[in-house]
Amino acid sequence: MKLSDMRALSAADFDKEIAARKKELMELRFQAAMGQLAQPHRVKQLKREVAQLNTIRSEQSRAARVAAQTGESQ
């Protein structure tokens, strides 16, 4: 998923996407432990996507807090 697509997600969609990627990551780690991992690069890719989703979610919540604080002070 591209960053522009990630930024367009709603708050509920962030949680769904993160949960889906973490579940897939868990399954891939299990496959790696069993020695049956077909795409080892996918583990790195999923970890990166989870981190990007978490970063975007925190950026958006921080921006919302700042907007609320500036709105109160006016």
Swiss-Prot record:
Gene3D superfamilies registered for this protein in UniProt: 1.10.287.310
PROSITE patterns: RIBOSOMAL_L29
UniProt entry tagged with the keyword Ribonucleoprotein: yes
Molecular function terms, GO-annotated: structural constituent of ribosome
Keyword Protease in annotation: no
Keywords: Ribonucleoprotein, Ribosomal protein
InterPro entries hit by this protein: Ribosomal_protein_uL29 (IPR050063), Ribosomal_uL29 (IPR001854), Ribosomal_uL29_CS (IPR018254), Ribosomal_uL29_sf (IPR036049)
HAMAP family: Ribosomal_uL29 (MF_00374)
Protein name: Large ribosomal subunit protein uL29
Gene: rpmC
